[in-house]
Design a protein with these regions (language model features):
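Membrane-interface helix termini and inter-helical loops of multi-pass transporters
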Residues: 2-3, 32-44, 72-76, 160-162
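N-terminal membrane topogenic signal
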Residues: 3-16
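Alpha-helical transmembrane segments of multi-pass membrane proteins
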Residues: 19-34
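Membrane-interface loop-to-helix entry segments
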Residues: 46-61, 104-116
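Helix-adjacent hinge/juxtasegments
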Residues: 60-97
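Membrane-interface helix caps and helix-loop-helix hairpins in membrane proteins
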Residues: 76, 96-107, 128-132
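Hydrophobic alpha-helical segments of small multi-pass membrane proteins
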Residues: 83-96, 110-123, 141-145
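Juxtamembrane boundary at the C-terminal end of a transmembrane helix
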Residues: 150-163
């Protein structure tokens, strides 16, 4: 492999590996067991089967946004910031699942979701000046996290307090 090949494909490799790590970690953390099934849910909640395909689409779009942003970044400092933003976002995403599904604390997950939402917004805003397409590719993620936060908030209201 030449240095040129690696320079071109490095962001793709990062996006694919990071996306797979997050998907596997999220699958482990998401326990749709008796506790979850016992929660009262709002009538507007999407069916459970929708979440897997939606997160798959979101991760594909986010991965594409990362790769495009990486290739259009004006300098190494911007690339470093982009990598950090995506890592932080992935960690927020994973921690939310652990809080909600493993620790059975939707109330804590709701507070943590603010960080998740802000991390998506940060990526969207950070990329818009040098890669507007990357920024737009993050928009569905921001919308989906907004819906998830509304669902999370409603679940807390319907079922809280949690201990």
């Amino acid at each position: 492999m030449s240095a040129e090949w690696f320079a071109h494909y490095k962001p793709i490799i990062f996006a694919v590996v990071w996306g797979l790590v997050l998907a596997l970690a999220g699958a482990w953390a998401t326990d749709i067991g008796e506790w979850y099934k016992s929660l009262q849910q709002p009538p507007w909640k999407p069916p459970d089967w929708v979440f897997g395909p939606m997160w798959t689409v979101i991760f594909i779009l986010a991965g594409a946004a990362f790769v495009m942003g990486y290739h259009r970044a004006p300098n190494q400092e911007t690339i470093r910031m982009l990598v950090i933003l995506f890592i932080v976002n992935g960690l927020f995403n994973f921690i939310w699942s652990v809080l909600y599904f493993r620790m059975h604390r939707p109330d804590w997950a709701l507070i943590e979701a603010i960080g998740l939402w802000l991390s998506v917004l940060a990526i969207l805003l950070a990329t818009r000046s040098y890669s507007p397409v990357s920024s737009w590719l993050m928009a569905p993620y921001l919308v989906w996290v907004s819906i998830a936060m509304a669902l999370n908030w409603t679940t807390v209201k319907l079922n809280g307090p949690f201990t």
